Amino acid sequence: MYRSVNNGVYRAGFATAQDKYDAAVTELFGALDWLEKRLATRRWLCGTRLTEADVRLFTTLVRFDAVYYSHFKCNLRRLVDYPRLWRYTRRFYALPGVARTVDLAEIKSHYYRSMKHINPTQIVPKGPALDFSLR
């Protein structure tokens, strides 16, 4: 998961050649497709219990639509286009104490303002409006 997903978004975002970007995006979305299918039969990645693998995946998924989709050009599909991964992310977000650790405004500000080689104007987009609640 680290190479394909966690680091996959960075491999796409920092790619300096089309073939490197294409390879990273293809691998990333192949992994997301696989994870979407895997979550059809289990609550968490490794079954019924939360594991470190879930924590690692959540940190990438919670940033996906707000940052990686546009800033890193990981834009074949949004997280919300994956019903199981979207529900999984919202379920993780609803765990006690997790929501208070996620500040999307700060996350977006950090990514869009600190990576001048990707975003020379340092403009932080207003959207997307994301609701991680389990309504």
Please provide the spans of the model-predicted regions.
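C-terminal alpha-helical interaction module
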Residues: 1-135
